[in-house]
Amino acid sequence: MTRTVAVLRGFGPVFALLFGLQFISMGAMEMNGPFWPIQIKALSPSDSVFGLAGIGVYVCPMLGVSLTSAFWGRMGDRYGNRLMMVRALLGLAITQLLVAFAQDVWTILALRFLQGACAGYIAPAQAYGVEVTGGRDRARLFAWLQVATNVGSLGGAFLGGLILDALPFAAVNLTAGVICAFCAAVAWTSLPVPLGGAGLTKTAKATTVSCAPSTGVSVFGLLALMGLLLASRMVLQVPFSLYMSEVYGSQHWITGLSYGLLALGFVVAAPVWARTFEGREPSFVLGCNVLIAGGCFVATGLAGSTRAIGLFAALYFTWGALLGGTTPVLLSLVSAATRSERQGSVLGLAQTCQQGASVVGIIAGVAATQRFGLKAAFPLVTGLYGLSFLVALGLWLKARQSRR
């Protein structure tokens, strides 16, 4: 806790507020995350509708985000990332409140798509963070913003499970909508408007768009690796609650807590990874990501084979800790390779790639479990991490050759 306070003070009071907004709003959005299959199954008139809607309830908002993130990023560069943050929070609040009153799966899917199209909060928050911190220490900046997201996910999933054990599913969405509306009001009244990016350092402004001349690794290569790592993680998004019920017979709050352990592992490890990678060459970061992908391969393979819930929880936590060294650090390399006036656009593109990869992972997970049963979920995750290992290895070897 002391270290967290010190980091927030080091970045300044505006970042502390930004951290708090990210923590609260993303936690609110994750309150219903692990429980959508239960609600969709209750509302579906047939198994075929459930199979389609069970995918769509996660894919639709991601499609919305992937289709609009680049556009909202350009709008952020033009009109300000602070305004885009407020817009996203209002969109989340309104659609969450509407979803609470939806009583058929098709209305829910339409609203979830609209939710994604109107949202896209994370990319402008990252770009705004670069502005208010002067573009310094991006790895730690993105790591701590991701920590806020994952701490919120941990608390949100657990709180959502508690609410669902006592109240109808609509209560979860109503609570999330009110919280997002509150965050929008706080962002509008409390976050300062950066004066034309004046807070950015000259070094940040002089950064070039491509990192290839100095590292031999393109921005698109980094985005591809991030996408594959995300697809691997998202395979379990839909079947997780059903897997926990079938294999362990767990209650909703245990499912929510287990779901949040991935986020908790990330929270604990991400700042450590950020300090480890601070000032390091991209080739070092990629080399570590080769080892991280291999570690994820082992952890998920063991998690899928155990029937002891204690060991499963420990492995899920370990998996999250390994993931702390992936997306934030790779994203910081992308940001550092981008001119200051294009931060919104490029981070919006990164968000589009991440959401697209998440969609692929979700569809792959649902297709595999529908075809082969829930037992196929973890082997698929393990296989995708094997592929991630090979991609990271290729990028690392290319970076080493470039240095020579």
UniProtKB/Swiss-Prot annotation:
A GO term from the CC aspect: plasma membrane
Keywords noted in UniProt: Cell inner membrane, Cell membrane, Membrane, Plasmid, Transmembrane, Transmembrane helix, Transport
Membrane-topology descriptor: Multi-pass membrane protein
GO molecular function: transmembrane transporter activity
This protein's record includes keyword Membrane: yes
Gene3D superfamilies in alphabetical order: MFS general substrate transporter like domains
PROSITE patterns, per the entry: MFS
Subcellular localization(s) per the UniProt record: Cell inner membrane
Transmembrane segment boundaries: 11-31, 49-69, 89-109, 151-171, 178-198, 211-231, 253-273, 284-304, 311-331, 346-366, 377-397
Coarse class of the protein's main subcellular location: membrane
InterPro entries in alphabetical order: MFS, MFS_dom, MFS_MdtG_subfamily, MFS_trans_sf
Keyword Transmembrane helix tagged: yes
UniProt family annotation: Belongs to the major facilitator superfamily.
Protein name: Uncharacterized MFS-type transporter y4xM
Provenance organism: Sinorhizobium fredii (strain NBRC 101917 / NGR234)
